[in-house]
């Protein structure tokens, strides 16, 4: 049969029946992916305005994931090491030392928005637990979570600690958001924009009816997400933008269901990966207009999406007629070894990859046991909310 002939041809060339099992093909695919990642990320405005890159594209392509590379700060000329795999822009450790007043800085920012009263270190809401900041008029609470003191080892914060506080606040009709230390340190402008949006005090307002929809290329999408979304770039295949006077104001991206989240690909079923607007800007009706365009032009039968429970209560999805399907369990990030002020996603530290990333690797230990042995800690989030939209 044709299938047998195909398998034989692949076996003759690569020594395996399935081409995806070939180490040669895997290496080519990885290098191609890293080449595209380099091209998209290292040309973003957010990176180019802050650092000089002191390595070549070839060096990046040949190295393994989560390898540290050298950068030079454009402000103070400090040279430092950082990795790119998490999609964050490398940040100079000299210019961005986080003061012990993390919570005070957030407090001062909120007060500058003329939001009052703002109470500090409140124990009367979910006693005996403490809330860092409470905006009683807005029914909004804010936690400023330093990585060290909110880690599982150093801070003795268990898997459900942050989620539990969120749920206790919800029972009181209070929305709780958690700001992780590295978000405030590295993406302060985006965090401030999110807080403004939650408090409905954005600087600029435009209306979707005055905007036109365009398909957006990878470079433009990457640049916009890196500058305006806390989670940064994505691997979406469909990118839709709202333009006003030729300026990109909002972006919504879609793609296949992600297997890493336990999903299997289903025909005509898509995941909404990202939605964001330009910093400090409210685009009234933007999400609805982009979603309707996607449905009209791509004919999905179902769309799913996930809301980060640290930041979102899912109100955007319910306004778009999504139905909440489930509550996801908390996820964790690693931090500590050589970089105690930055989180690294667990996907980059699966046990089968650890032998090349840590000094002391024991195949008889679990991933977490190996990381602990090497002086890493981890911090848990609040999980995610899964939403679904069925299209008739």
Predicted regions and their residues:
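Short hydrophobic/aromatic beta-strand or adjacent loop that forms the aromatic wall/cage
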Residues: 130, 237-239, 382-387
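Active-site beta-strand termini and strand-to-loop segments that position acidic
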Residues: 133-138, 242-245, 389-392
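Acyl-donor binding region in acyl/amide transferases
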Residues: 215, 236, 244, 250-375
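Nucleic-acid endo/exonuclease domains
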Residues: 1-226, 230-237, 276-314, 335-341, ...
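A residue-level signal for beta-strand positions that form part of recognition/binding surfaces
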Residues: 210, 269, 384
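Short, well-ordered beta-strand micro-motif
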Residues: 70-72, 143, 241-243, 386-390
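A generic structural signal for short, non-catalytic loop/turn and secondary-structure boundary residues
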Residues: 46, 206-208, 247, 265, ...
């Amino acid at each position: 049969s044709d299938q047998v002939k195909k398998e034989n041809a692949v076996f003759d060339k690569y020594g395996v029946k399935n081409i995806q099992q070939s180490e040669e093909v895997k290496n080519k695919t990885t290098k191609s992916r890293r080449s595209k990642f380099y091209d998209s990320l290292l040309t973003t405005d957010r990176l180019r305005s802050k650092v000089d890159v002191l390595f070549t594209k070839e060096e990046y392509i040949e190295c393994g994931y989560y390898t540290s590379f050298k950068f030079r700060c454009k402000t103070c000329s400090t040279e430092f090491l950082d990795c790119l795999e998490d999609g964050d822009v490398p940040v100079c450790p000299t210019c961005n030392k986080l003061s012990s007043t993390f919570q005070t800085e957030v407090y001062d920012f909120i007060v500058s928005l003329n939001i009052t009263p703002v109470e500090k270190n409140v124990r009367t809401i979910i006693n005996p637990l403490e809330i860092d900041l409470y905006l009683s008029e807005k029914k909004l609470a804010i936690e400023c979570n330093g990585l060290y003191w909110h880690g599982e080892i150093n801070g003795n914060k268990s898997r459900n600690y942050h989620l539990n506080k969120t749920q206790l606040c919800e029972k009181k009709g209070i929305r709780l958001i958690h700001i992780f230390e590295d978000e405030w340190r590295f993406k302060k402008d985006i965090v401030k924009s999110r807080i403004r949006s939650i408090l409905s005090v954005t600087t600029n307002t435009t209306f979707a009816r005055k905007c036109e929809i365009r398909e957006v290329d990878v470079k433009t999408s990457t640049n916009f997400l890196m500058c305006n979304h806390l989670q940064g770039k994505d691997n979406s295949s469909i990118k839709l933008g709202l333009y006003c006077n030729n300026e990109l104001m909002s972006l919504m991206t879609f793609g296949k269901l992600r297997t890493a989240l336990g999903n299997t690909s289903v025909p005509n079923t898509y995941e909404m990966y990202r939605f964001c607007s330009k910093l400090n800007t409210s685009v009234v009706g933007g999400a609805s207009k982009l979603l309707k365009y996607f449905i009209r032009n791509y004919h999905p039968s179902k769309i799913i999406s996930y809301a980060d429970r640290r930041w979102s209560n899912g109100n955007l999805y319910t306004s778009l007629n999504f139905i909440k399907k489930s509550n996801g369990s908390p996820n964790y990030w690693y931090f500590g070894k050589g970089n105690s002020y930055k989180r690294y996603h667990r996907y980059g530290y699966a046990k089968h990859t650890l032998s090349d990333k840590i000094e002391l690797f024991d195949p008889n230990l679990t991933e977490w046991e190996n990381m602990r042995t090497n002086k890493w800690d981890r911090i848990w989030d609040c999980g995610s909310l899964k939403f679904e939209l069925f299209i008739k």
